[in-house]
Amino acid sequence: MQKKVLIKIILDRKLHNNHQEYGLAIRGLIRHHSIDPLDYDKNCDLAIPLEEILSPDPKLRQLLLDIDRSKARVWCITNAYKTHALRVLKIMNLSDLIEGVVSCDYTNLNFHCKPEKEYYQEAVARSLGQEPSAENLEQADFSDHLLVDDALINIVGASKIGFGSSVHFDEDSDAVTGAHSTKSKDGTPFERITALDQLRNLDVWKDCFVNKST
């Protein structure tokens, strides 16, 4: 019982700082507060009543259905533990449209997460059906990979290492704007959308969708 209370106290005071320093709050909790990562997952992510929060999105499902699978493969890459990711995909009725999931291994003290290059290297290797090794990680070519993510830090990280397209899904933006190119504070280029359907209009992405006019 004390550990659960401790998690709550730490989350209230330290979560933001851990996220900023480590890219993911749980890494700071593991390294500095001896939190059991699987206990954290059980009492935090798995305890969230997602069935009451999430529901299938027909527009999102149609967007994924409209991707030409002879031109593009769809993977989910997440900083969550795999059980949480699979649970979300099932609730959203998207499991059958996702070819694979790359997640964080909470059982590994030194696990990588977005936006670290090592995480993206492993994601590329796994999407190509390769077991990550020193050789194929170093040879990872990001130019044929496209990423859309709702966390700007992840998009900037992907753009810096050469992803073919890095798109920030700014769902909370007050501006009603279409897809557009922009730059981060340090000058890193990326694209921003305020609705996922706007991916259809981006130069690189639109070639991945089925042409319904023919």
Model-derived regions: residue spans:
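Conserved phosphate-coupling serine/threonine residues in phosphotransfer and NTP-handling enzymes
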Residues: 78-80
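Short, surface-exposed alpha-helical recognition segments that flank or form part
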Residues: 51-55, 76, 111-115
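Asp-based, Mg2+/Mn2+-dependent phosphohydrolase catalytic module
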Residues: 65-68, 82-214
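N-terminal helical cap/lid subdomain that shapes the substrate entry/recognition surface
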Residues: 1-58, 62, 69, 83
